[in-house]
């Protein structure tokens, strides 16, 4: 599995960058925001999410870990694929998107190409509670994703996350959350 690339930007388009790494050129899907920050000939380090499908092996690239985490979370929402998740990241930074979810601005979300009212509402419902407002947010988001990947529902996870002690390590938080969810 490819989780990162360090190489030279060979070619850039709106939603794709070609990165040359030791003689091999990788086609990486990127948001328009990321694309705008890249320059041909620039040495770059991208965080990669590799998605293997029946008919495709796709690489999605991110300059920031927060973008990658948000992208992964968006892919878990039924009806949101890579194209729509990239459109969201092209339209909003992770912080802007977090604000949109927190303030329930469905209309702004509907401005993203490919998102209608129904999908915007679904995204709002699924992401409420994903963005936790405290200094431990990145760790809490990782705990959320880990529990969700184990099959727990967003509502259950959010309820348990509110009860966890704030300074737990990610591992300890997952362990404690699992104990609460299984009891």
From Swiss-Prot:
Q: Where is this region: Flexible linker?
A: 139
GO biological process, any? DNA repair
GO cellular component annotations of the record: cytoplasm; Holliday junction helicase complex; Holliday junction resolvase complex
Bilayer-spanning residue ranges? none
What does the UniProt entry say about where the protein is found? Cytoplasm
Stored SMART domains? HhH1
Q: Which domain of life is it from?
A: Bacteria
Q: Its quaternary structure?
A: Homotetramer. Forms an RuvA(8)-RuvB(12)-Holliday junction (HJ) complex. HJ DNA is sandwiched between 2 RuvA tetramers; dsDNA enters through RuvA and exits via RuvB. An RuvB hexamer assembles on each DNA strand where it exits the tetramer. Each RuvB hexamer is contacted by two RuvA subunits (via domain III) on 2 adjacent RuvB subunits; this complex drives branch migration. In the full resolvosome a probable DNA-RuvA(4)-RuvB(12)-RuvC(2) complex forms which resolves the HJ.
About its domains, the entry says:
Has three domains with a flexible linker between the domains II and III and assumes an 'L' shape. Domain III is highly mobile and contacts RuvB.
User: Which named protein is this?
Assistant: Holliday junction branch migration complex subunit RuvA
UniProt organism field = Helicobacter pylori (strain HPAG1)
